[in-house]
């Protein structure tokens, strides 16, 4: 989980943009990404 969080943390807003673009095409990845992405970006990343 930490590694995954770090990757999303580095991406920051970029991860959200990619998630929005790829979301409609891959629902499975979209469902798995949002919760971890949002939590990691807010908690782990100050920016």
UniProtKB/Swiss-Prot annotation:
Protein name: Putative uncharacterized protein YBR126W-B
Domain of life per record: Eukaryota
Chain segments carrying region Disordered: 22-47
Note: Partially overlaps YBR126W-A.
């Amino acid at each position: 989980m930490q590694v995954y969080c770090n990757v999303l943390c580095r991406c920051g807003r970029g991860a959200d943009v990619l998630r929005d673009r790829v979301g409609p095409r891959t629902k499975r990845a979209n469902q798995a990404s949002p919760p971890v992405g949002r939590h990691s970006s807010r908690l782990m990343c100050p920016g």
